[in-house]
């Protein structure tokens, strides 16, 4: 018996998802399936299309697994477009006139990019951003261009702008509307997005109507209605999409007034045997331009063909994504257009975070919201909206930082109904995930495999994990609290192992109590524990591979790969000569200078190779390191106290100096801040610090476990009218007990709140020595105090360590991408305009350095011709990758931590903690190409690097 024929026109993301849904229902056995694909590539991931410019190949973007078509007997016709539909004859004709019969016809023709019909839109140098072929043309043009302009400031336009930036172009975005992402964001969110994108060096031009595009001697020029103009070398149109409905029109199918193939709840067109799904389909006068609704249409249509009940009833258009490195989320009625609705907004200007929620008139339901700069609340808020969950009495608490005594605002997954949609891309509910866990799926890999949750855009990953862990706990399965895959221990247990067994190195610890090579979680944690216990020099060969970039170079890394320098100024005291020396150094090295809230001076913009020279001059002027880079004591802030102030009752400055010099260099689970006030007027703000001291007529009041920041907490009064010796003894005990028992990266405030008994328990333990360990804690602190060393002074006296402070092991040239401009009389970051791709050496192999020049289990920067690369020494192997950290403009990958993930050697980038495989430069999770990888060989102790990237060599072969 001859099978009926199902023809699918269009093989994009939605089209392929339809095929997968058909296969899962065995429809490939009921139908002969023929697929027409206009492009030369089978379906690929358009969501991550920009990664193509980061070195990801067309093959890695493909959505087609292995021999999918052969295995399931589906016929794929690549580079074949359908020219017409003959509904009476039930055939489609391709561009060559060949006819293919169909019994069911599915149109998944997608959309095409909208190009405004302005004069000059078709000039050479004008492109659209839609397909891999489009991207190849853009890349070819960008190789000889300096500046690129994108017309369109929506989702697609900002994606295209990101692509141009990755190609090294000076990038501008032109938008007709007053705001970027005008559909998704309100005015406040759009303003914050614009501010953040502008800081990245992207020019933003809103309210610009392009009247013409002309060619001149310099290239292209856009002329605007307001009389202004903008010159460019190339232009990319990414101003939205239009449904690809021409085929349906020619076949006499019903289409919308503004385009789109009209469909019903079963995705049927005006001809019941012709179906339409995805961006070409118009459902209730609405075109869905996101992949998740298209997937839902595809799944619904396949289910209907298989005889299952159900219908397509619309889809949530909420979205969460990262645009040019900026987290953005929009859901529901983001613009607040519902009659009578109320909105709450919160802005954190310094951190460039904007949050807004819209609630119903009665304040009972969440209707929508906008998040820019921090989208961490997206999953919680979206579930509350989709499931109609009751709002708290004060809805604003959902977006405000948690205050003292308030409960966490995160929504417990136990409160979600089983039908709550967790993954919109694949329509996976909470119940689906719980069922998968009950069926034996006990980790994220198994959940993804069984349900496909978190395999689409990935935005639901955190919530999927929460549901999985909830169900595991419900089944009585212990959810491990191991710090990472390398150590089945908590931080407290690791501290105990190190202290009791006198373990002095990471290698000793992992050999006895762990496995593998470590990661960005356990290495810095163990480094901190070792320093708290033994206080050895951090750059000893055994300790260097554990240090994050700030501790490895004793400075705070900034967004452009330079560092900030903070000399210690105990209690804020500084001599006139000291001030003059700091000013002269800042001027000599062109450093941006700023007074900090901790009463110190911060100098920004020091290149890696400049740090030793800067610190040599600071040391000669009497300064030592301020430990602004470490999880350690930062500052002890003070007022002038009784020395100068008429209200002061004690010498607060003198005590602050004593405390700062006592605890400087103390490593802890998190940073420690202190303050001393000379009277109850509290000018030093001691009650907002980890350790706060306020003078009284009889002595000192001690306050503990406060902090400022995003979640401020008022410190608790711990003891009153203490003499100085008792005060210091109490602080010694409390800090060492905190170091012993706190979790990883846990501030003192959270630590105390999690202690059973809270501050009362601490008083008994510290003041009354209820556990009998007071003297032991004091002795541990005494050893730390006695073993203090200024890390910079030690480094300056060690030529071998100084050799690590260089940007390139084989060149003394500075990083050309670090540029400065003057603003308010001071040096500031300036965008770097790349002049095409850096030149590679003409010879196949270039000698870079001696093997011993690369630290064991660490990396160092180098130059391959003019290209910046990172060399990593992992055991007996040497690897070479591009030095540019993905998603940044900083050549800093060489300063990342080395480790492994499931035995796979990886580097963890220093700025944004991205896990990248050393062998091929791909992302550890997902396999997307992150950076280029280069061949390496070691001969006679010399490291050589090849001039043809590994990916290109592999594809050529």
UniProtKB/Swiss-Prot annotation:
This is Nitrite reductase [NAD(P)H] large subunit. Binds 1 siroheme per subunit. NAD(+) binds at residues 193-225. [2Fe-2S] cluster binds at residues 423, 425, 457, 460. GO terms for biological process: nitrate assimilation. Its EC number is 1.7.1.4. The gene is nasB. The keyword Flavoprotein applies. FAD binds at residues 44-79. Keywords: 2Fe-2S, 4Fe-4S, FAD, Flavoprotein, Heme, Iron, Iron-sulfur, Metal-binding, NADP, Nitrate assimilation, Oxidoreductase. Disulfide bonds: none annotated. PROSITE patterns: NIR_SIR, NIRD.
């Amino acid at each position: 018996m001859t099978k009926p024929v199902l023809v699918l026109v269009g093989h994009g993301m939605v089209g392929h998802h339809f095929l997968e849904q058909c296969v899962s229902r065995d429809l490939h056995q009921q139908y002969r399936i023929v697929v027409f694909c206009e492009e030369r590539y089978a379906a690929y991931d358009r969501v991550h299309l920009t990664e193509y410019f980061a070195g990801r190949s067309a093959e890695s973007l493909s959505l087609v697994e292995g021999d999918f078509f052969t295995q399931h007997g589906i016929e794929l016709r690549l580079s074949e477009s359908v020219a017409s539909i003959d509904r009476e004859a039930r055939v489609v004709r391709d561009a060559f006139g060949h006819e293919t019969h169909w019994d069911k016809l599915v149109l998944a023709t997608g959309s095409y990019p909208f190009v405004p019909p302005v004069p000059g839109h078709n000039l050479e140098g004008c492109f659209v951003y839609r397909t891999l072929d489009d991207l190849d043309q853009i890349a070819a043009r960008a190789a000889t261009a300096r500046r690129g302009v994108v017309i369109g400031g929506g989702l697609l336009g900002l994606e295209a702008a990101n692509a141009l930036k990755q190609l090294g172009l000076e990038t501008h975005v032109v938008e007709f509307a007053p705001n970027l992402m005008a559909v998704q964001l309100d005015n406040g969110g759009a303003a914050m997005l614009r501010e953040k994108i502008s800081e990245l060096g992207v020019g933003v031009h809103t309210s610009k109507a392009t009247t013409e595009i002309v060619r001149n001697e310099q290239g292209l020029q856009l002329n605007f209605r307001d009389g202004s103009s903008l010159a460019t070398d190339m232009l990319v149109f990414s101003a939205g999409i239009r449904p690809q409905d021409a085929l349906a029109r020619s076949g006499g199918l019903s289409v919308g007034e503004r385009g789109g193939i009209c469909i019903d709840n079963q995705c049927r067109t005006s001809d019941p045997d012709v179906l339409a799904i995805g961006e070409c389909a118009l459902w209730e006068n609405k075109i869905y331009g996101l992949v998740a609704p298209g997937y839902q249409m595809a799944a619904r249509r396949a289910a209907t063909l298989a005889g299952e009940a159900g219908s397509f009833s619309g889809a949530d258009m909420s979205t969460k994504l990262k645009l040019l490195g900026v987290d953005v989320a929009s859901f529901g009625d983001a613009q607040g257009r519902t009659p009578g609705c109320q909105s709450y907004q919160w802005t954190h200007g310094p951190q460039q975070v904007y949050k807004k929620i819209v609630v119903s008139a009665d304040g009972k339901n969440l209707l929508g919201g906008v998040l820019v700069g921090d989208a961490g609340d997206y999953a919680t808020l979206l579930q509350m909206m989709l499931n109609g969950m009751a709002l708290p009495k004060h809805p604003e608490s959902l977006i405000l930082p948690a205050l003292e005594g308030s409960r966490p605002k995160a929504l417990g997954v136990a409160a979600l109904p089983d039908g709550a949609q967790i993954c919109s891309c694949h329509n996976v509910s909470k119940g689906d995930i719980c069922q998968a866990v009950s069926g034996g799926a006990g980790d994220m890999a198994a959940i993804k495999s069984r349900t496909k949750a978190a395999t689409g855009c990935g935005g639901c990953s955190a919530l999927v994990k929460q549901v999985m862990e909830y169900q595991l706990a419900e089944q009585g399965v212990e959810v491990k609290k191991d710090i990472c895959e390398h150590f089945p221990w908590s931080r407290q247990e690791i501290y105990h192992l190190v202290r009791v067994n006198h373990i002095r190195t990471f290698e000793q610890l992992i050999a006895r109590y762990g496995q593998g090579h470590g990661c960005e979680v356990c290495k810095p944690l163990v480094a901190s524990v070792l320093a708290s216990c033994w206080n050895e020099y951090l750059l000893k060969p055994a300790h260097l591979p554990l240090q994050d970039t700030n501790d490895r170079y004793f400075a705070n890394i900034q967004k452009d790969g330079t560092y900030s320098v903070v000399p210690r100024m105990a209690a804020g005291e500084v001599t006139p000569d000291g001030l003059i020396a700091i000013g002269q150094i800042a001027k000599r090295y062109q450093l941006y200078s700023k007074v900090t809230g901790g009463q110190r001076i911060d100098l920004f913009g020091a290149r890696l190779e400049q740090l030793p020279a800067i610190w040599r001059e600071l040391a000669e002027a009497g300064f030592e390191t301020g430990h602004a880079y470490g999880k350690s004591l930062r500052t002890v802030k003070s007022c002038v106290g009784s020395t100068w102030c008429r209200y002061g009752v004690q010498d607060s400055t003198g005590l602050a100096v004593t405390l700062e010099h006592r605890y400087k260099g103390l490593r802890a689970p998190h940073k420690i801040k202190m303050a001393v006030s000379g009277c109850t007027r509290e000018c030093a703000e001691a009650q907002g610090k980890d350790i706060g001291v306020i003078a009284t007529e009889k002595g000192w009041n001690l306050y503990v476990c406060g902090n400022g920041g995003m979640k401020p907490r008022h410190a608790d009064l711990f003891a009153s009218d203490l003499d100085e010796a008792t005060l210091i003894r109490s602080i010694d005990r409390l800090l060492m007990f905190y170091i012993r028992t706190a979790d990883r990266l846990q501030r003192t405030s959270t630590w105390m709140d999690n202690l059973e008994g809270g501050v009362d328990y601490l008083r008994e333990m510290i003041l009354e020595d209820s556990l009998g360990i007071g003297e032991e804690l004091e002795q541990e602190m005494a050893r730390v105090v006695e073993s203090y060393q200024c890390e910079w002074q030690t480094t300056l006296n060690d030529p071998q360590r100084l050799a690590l402070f260089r940007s390139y092991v084989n060149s003394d040239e500075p990083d050309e991408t670090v540029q400065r401009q003057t603003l308010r009389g001071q040096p500031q970051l300036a965008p770097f305009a790349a002049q095409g791709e850096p030149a590679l050496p003409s010879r196949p192999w270039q000698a870079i350095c001696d093997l011993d020049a690369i630290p064991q289990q660490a990396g160092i920067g180098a130059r391959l011709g003019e290209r910046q690369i990172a060399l990593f020494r992992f055991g007996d192997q040497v690897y070479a990758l591009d030095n540019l950290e993905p998603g940044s403009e900083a050549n800093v990958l060489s300063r990342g931590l080395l480790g492994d993930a499931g035995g796979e050697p990886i580097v963890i980038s220093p700025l944004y903690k991205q896990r990248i495989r050393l062998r091929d430069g791909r992302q550890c999770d997902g396999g997307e190409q992150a950076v280029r990888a280069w061949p390496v060989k070691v001969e006679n102790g010399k490291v050589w690097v090849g001039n043809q990237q590994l990916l290109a060599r592999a594809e050529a072969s």
